């Protein structure tokens, strides 16, 4: 499995023949200056955790250019269908549901956040936010938490899915901060490795992963903080 972080919550995962982008906020991302074309090369799937603009990002352009499958909640799926994405390439789901993505499955799990898109000064409701658990038959299970606070039912996510890799928001203000995120990882999960995200993008959120790293000291989980664009082989 290969994972590349592009800053904020944008990731590319290559595993089991799939090339997946999650929350592809690439153009306009202050921590990634090289556009969406490179990260989207050969992509087979685009997965979205919720409907905020800094997570939808370049989804429409990527879908039109690559022919990738969209995996998202019902409302986001309908939104992109109305933008001209063919229904055959849209794979919707919702809380608790698991969808077959061809080569892996995605399960929609809870996240404590909000989800809408602002257009022409108005908010467009785009369903509930989610975390996403990706199961690969012959590789590690990945849990992208989306944007969220800590919550007690993370224990059920561990019980049901046993994710080995965690992609964890730590930037505070709009998600849990680093210390709380570390508590979530240590109390509820047995991750082999975690990559913190949703930090350092805008001045209003935490700029470094130091609080998270400090909170994870002594844990068996490996904390990886690659610079944006650097591939990690897991």
From Swiss-Prot:
This is UPF0173 metal-dependent hydrolase Meso_1362. The keyword Ubl conjugation does not apply. One of its GO terms (molecular function) is hydrolase activity. SUPFAM superfamilies: Metallo-hydrolase/oxidoreductase (SSF56281). InterPro entries: Metallo-B-lactamas, RibonucZ/Hydroxyglut_hydro, UPF0173, UPF0173_UPF0282_UlaG_hydrolase. It comes from Chelativorans sp. (strain BNC1). Coiled coil: none annotated. The keyword Hydrolase applies. SMART domains: Lactamase_B. Keywords: Hydrolase. Belongs to the UPF0173 family. The lineage of its organism: Bacteria, Pseudomonadati, Pseudomonadota, Alphaproteobacteria, Hyphomicrobiales.
């Amino acid at each position: 499995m290969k994972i590349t972080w592009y800053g904020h919550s944008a990731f590319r995962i290559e595993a089991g023949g799939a090339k997946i982008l999650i929350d592809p906020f690439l153009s306009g991302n202050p921590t990634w200056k090289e556009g969406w074309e490179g990260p989207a090369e050969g992509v087979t799937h685009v997965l979205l955790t919720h409907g905020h603009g800094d997570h939808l990002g370049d989804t429409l352009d990527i879908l039109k250019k690559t022919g990738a499958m969209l995996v998202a909640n019902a409302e986001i799926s309908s939104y992109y269908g109305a933008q001209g994405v063919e229904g055959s390439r849209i794979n919707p789901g919702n809380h608790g549901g698991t969808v077959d993505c061809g080569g892996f499955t995605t399960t929609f799990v809870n996240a404590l956040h909000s989800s809408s898109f602002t257009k022409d000064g108005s908010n467009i409701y785009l369903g509930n936010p989610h975390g996403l658990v990706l199961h690969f038959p012959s590789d590690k299970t990945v849990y992208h938490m989306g944007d969220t606070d800590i919550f007690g039912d993370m224990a059920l996510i561990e019980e049901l899915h046993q994710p080995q890799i965690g992609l964890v928001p730590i930037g505070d203000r709009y998600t849990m901060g680093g210390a709380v995120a570390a508590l979530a990882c240590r109390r509820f999960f047995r991750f082999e490795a975690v990559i913190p995200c949703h930090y350092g993008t805008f001045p209003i959120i935490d700029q470094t992963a130091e609080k998270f790293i400090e909170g994870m000291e002594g844990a068996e989980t490996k904390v990886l903080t690659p610079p944006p664009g650097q591939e990690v082989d897991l």
